A protein has these predicted regions:
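AAA+ ATPase active-site-proximal loops
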Residues: 132-143
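Acidic, metal-coordinating helix/loop segments flanking the phosphotransfer/catalytic sites
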Residues: 39-57
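C-terminal output helix
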Residues: 95, 112-122
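Acidic catalytic/metal-coordinating carboxylates
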Residues: 42, 68-71, 89
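Active-site beta3 strand of CheY-like receiver
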Residues: 54-59, 64, 86
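The feature encodes the CheY-like receiver
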Residues: 23, 65, 89, 93
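Short amphipathic alpha-helix used as the core "switch/output" element in two-component signaling
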Residues: 48, 70-82, 99
Length: 143
């Protein structure tokens, strides 16, 4: 279970998923872990909630009935650059994961993801990558 100190001073979390049962179950589990949860079942609902203020954390389903979850990721990233965003989907594909991360998602999980996995992904503090070498190795040198 997450400690409040791990979550930080702003425990706000937006959950966006059109599977109402999953959304409610995950919301209850995340509240028990110390998050202050807002729920949206569509891109449109998420946009309305974002107008009231962007959360510190978000979990967004990729495929929603009224659009693409990446639209929510993009809107959230514009509203709050430091938000930690996890994208969920039942349709795992590398290309989609790459697109989600390029748009600003912190992580990408396949459904069914449990609350512990989601919490770990939201709170993970990835290490920064080392800078590229000044003289990168060419493909010819690797042969």
């Amino acid at each position: 279970m997450a400690e409040d100190s791990e979550i930080g001073p702003d425990p706000s979390l937006l959950l966006v998923d059109d599977d109402e049962i999953f959304l409610n179950r995950l919301a209850r589990a995340m509240e028990k872990r110390g998050f202050l949860v807002s729920r949206a079942a569509s891109v449109a609902e998420a946009r309305v909630l974002l107008e009231g203020g962007a959360p510190a954390f978000a979990v967004v389903d990729l495929r929603l009935e009224d659009g693409n979850g990446l639209d929510v990721v993009d809107a959230l990233r514009e509203a709050r650059a430091d938000a930690r965003i996890v994208v969920l989907t039942g349709y795992g594909a590398i290309a989609t994961a790459v697109a989600a991360v390029k748009m600003g998602a912190t992580d990408y999980l396949s459904k069914p993801a449990d609350a512990d996995e989601v919490t770990r992904a939201l709170l993970a503090r990835g290490e920064t990558l080392p800078p590229p070498p000044e003289t990168p190795m060419s493909a010819d040198r690797v042969r």
